[in-house]
Amino acid sequence: MSGRAVLSPQHAQASFDSGLQLYGDVPELNAVPPPSHSALMDFTRFDDFAFAYYGLPDQSSLVSLVDHTHTFQSLTTFPQHQAISGLAHSGLPFGTLPTDNYNQSMEDSKAPPDRTSPASNALEDPTTDEFGLASPNRAGGTDLGGKPKEDKADATPAWSELKTKAGKERKRLPLACIACRRKKIRCSGEKPACKQCLHSCIPCVYKVATRKAAPRTNCMAMLDKRPKRMEERAIKAISKSDQEVASSVTHPVVKQAIPGTVTSSRPTKKRGAEEAFEPDLEAWAKASSEPKIEGDDGSSSLQVQEGEENKLQHEGTEALPSREIQEHLAEVFFENIYGQSYHLLHKPSYMRKLKNGTLPPVLVLTVCAVAARFTSNPLVSSSGPEFLRGEEWASHARDICTRRYEWPNLTILTCLLILGLHEFGTCQGGRSWALGGQAIRMAFALQLHKDLEYDPSGRNGTTTQLSFIDREIRRRIMWACFLMDRFNSSGTDRPMFIREDTIQIPLPVKEKYFQFDMPAPTEMLDGRVPHPPSPNDGQIANSRENMGVAAFLIRAIALWGRIITYLSQGCKDLDPNPLWEDESHYMKHLDDVVNLEASLPLSLKHSAENLEVHKTENTASQFLFMHICLQHNILFVNRAAMSARKQHGVHDDFVSEASKRAFNAANRISELLREAEQSGCFVSAPFAGYCAFSSTTVHILGIISRNPFTKLAAQANLTTNIKYLHRMKKYWGMFHWMVENVRTQYRNVLDAMRAGANVEERATQPSFLQYGDWFNRYPRGLSDAEFMDPATHKRKDSGADGVLEAKRELRSVEEYFTLPTPRRVENKDTIRATAPKRKQSAKKQAGMPAQPGQHLDSLQSIDADAVSQERKFSGGLGLQITGAAGFNPLAASNQQSPDFSTTISPTRPANMTPFAHHAHTPTFFPPELLAMNFGQGSNGNIDPLDRQLIYGGYSMDASTGLGGGQDMMSGLGWDTVALGAQPDGRLQSRPSNAKAGMHGQSAGMADGAGLSRPEASSAWFMPFNMEPPDMDQDAGFNMGGIDPFTGVFGGGGSGLATPNALGGLILGHCRGSSTHSTR
């Protein structure tokens, strides 16, 4: 008989082997099966479990069949014993089976056969009755979950023979089956099925343990195992590459020493904590602090920064000019800006990257923005002022830089410094201050204040050694931040941020070493040498000789910063000693400025030979700028001593020596500016303009000196400085304010002279204008009205003052006379409507085309009652007239004679006076003189002797007009003069070349207005005992006209030299003076 085998790993019955052998000798069992055998043995009926059945073997040797025809009652009627239905149907007489053989087979097997298997006999089961129910032991409590009663022979379970891991006898069951554990009864532990499951006819399943239960240990053993578990967790957290390294390190077994006990001298297997962990601790301490995670280059913020840096290479490309303009403006930048304000960028590297197209667009935009003001290229030039040309490019660069303040890098830092300089030129005080502060913070974030040999921003633990050029670029960027901090913080209310002792880097090397990549050691700011070279390094050993213009310029500005801190930021009041004492801080600063100039190497001393050498190296402008700064320090220190003349206990010798040094330094600054003009080197640094302004304030005092030599030198040098300031205000807008301040100081001195007051005391009373004060003057830029039209100040409430006191609407008497009168709004339309008609009338009278800058119609239309108070402005000059109760001579003359606005040439016969023998050669006054305010009733001209010497006694009134109502003023087309034209042949004796001016510059009076007045008398005198100039005087003094003061503001709106057209006037003027003396 063959049956279907259903194999299940959970019910593999190894114990059935004995049962199969029991019936192996019975041949009848292998006969033809009954018809219902397949149906009875269908394995699908056994839902819970099934066993493999292969038929009965021969059972002749084990069982004797007495009656083959006897058929036992089928046991299939008992549903609880369906497992033996196959045997009942085959007609096997179970009652004749020998029990001894059966017991013997049970003893031979490792586990008793399953009662549901074919080898089991339900009738011989002691726990069941003839119906298959548990009758004998029904009251034993096993049906209720109690423990069954076992014989003593079966008391020893099979698992007791197993040994523990320690080799001892096992006393407890290692693992109970799931059913016994659920019923909370003792499990016999047999496999594959325990006795309880066999009796209950349920599957016996042993739960497979995923991990072995930890043995019970004491508390100290658990504490010892904790470091090992922590070490295993740490190993899982590190990368595989680090695991390979860590696997080679043996893990120490540490035995902690009990405190208070003496360690044994005998060797043990366990080491001490110091011996075991000391190498690992040292390696951990010296390891890099940056995380090393495989597959991750850094944190998310670092990834964002890298993405932004990648975008920086392309952002702003659409705003770039053409490649030709980029290269042109780059050359302009290195010619006019590099080295004078900041030593930024390496020209060979920049130009090479620019041609290859590998520069970030934001850097190119920044360079183009700051250099556009100095170019004359028609593709860049615009109709607006020069200092606003690059604003469009600067706006794009500014937007890119301000969005990346979180991720500092050298490119953005360089752009911030250059943009701060550009915003300085456009009078954006708030922007320049903010950009400078952001640049300083970014420089410290990049550790530029340290002289590092490796790039501190190295990622993934890689360190890149910096080349000499890169290290020098980093140093120069940090020094540029230092200079910007000194420039921006030179005001009264703006302290400096960077301390000198925080910068631990050497000073820049010479420019040729930097350009040609020649490493050389230099000194630090305090004179120390950080890295002295060895003889085998191949470097130049003399550190002082390796320093060029840039190094000593930084030292000069650093010293100026200390002087500013002492004089303007409260340190002067904290000095326990007065200025003239040797122990005072003032004397220390005075010694510093003298010693700094004396410490210059021979190659940097001022001489004509050194200037020629620097011209060959293209550093002549930097060389002159450095010497201007050195002289400015001397001037600044000694000017403070001049203002202390009224302090108690001051010595006269101290003040006189300080005055002498201040005048000498002011003269030296003017000489350097004149030398730069003559040698063709334009010193374009904004701070050089401030040095010229400081020198000008001293020259104004020199004009009133009783020493004739000092007076003449001051007049000539004052003209040089004013010319230079007029030129600088084209490129840097804040010099408009400085020129106005100079005009105000000049007017105060002139008023004091006329009033008979002490001029020196009055000139030194006001607080000195600081370089950083322009931030308060122009916090948010310069409007067109401030350099083209008079500014009208209208009181209005702002939202920021909403919680403050309400401002009064009325004016006091003092404010009425001192503050300007606002322009009437209702007259604006009248002014605009009448201006074109008057221009047409002027053209008809002149008979020649007139330039818009030559008309004064905007001033003629202002109401007569507001003329004496409102600040007037010369038409087309672009300058604002300031001062209390101002008086404009142009407006006064236009009111007195309506025909003064004509542009008829002063040399036409119709314009000549009948008293021709009393007239001099027509005077060509600079336009700034016409716009000057000399006080009420004064127009800057000198009246005849019959006038009284009183204040306001030199006014020009209408009664002095000439016969026939001839014009006392008439315009002149200065375009024709600048081009060398000679109107009516009267200017043939004058030089027509544009280079006839003081320093050979082109004439800049094209937008000015001429002034011609045939005098009523040839008898003139110099006011206030001023000597007439000599004929062999410098040509620059002959620009001023008949009054030595009138040459102060010569030069036209463009700031260039005025053609020397006053030679005949000076001769006639001297003649008139001699005639008056003989009269």
Curated annotation (Swiss-Prot):
One of its GO terms (cellular component) is nucleus. GO terms for biological process: DNA-templated transcription. SUPFAM superfamilies: Zn2/Cys6 DNA-binding domain. Residues 177-204 bind DNA. Keywords: Metal-binding, Nucleus, Transcription, Transcription regulation, Virulence. Its main location: nucleus. It comes from the Eukaryota. CDD domains: fungal_TF_MHR, GAL4. SMART domains: Fungal_trans (SM00906), GAL4 (SM00066). Induction: Exclusively expressed during infection of common bean. Pfam families: Fungal_trans, Zn_clus. It is found in: Nucleus. One of its GO terms (molecular function) is DNA-binding transcription factor activity, RNA polymerase II-specific. Coiled coil: none annotated. Multiple copies of the gene are present in highly virulent fusarium oxysporum strains. Zn(2)-C6 fungal-type transcription factor that has a role in the establishment of the fungus within the plant and/or the progress of the disease. Regulates the expression of virulence factors such as SIX1 and SIX6. This is Zn(2)-C6 fungal-type transcription factor FTF1a. It comes from Fusarium oxysporum f. sp. lycopersici (strain 4287 / CBS 123668 / FGSC 9935 / NRRL 34936) (Fusarium vascular wilt of tomato).
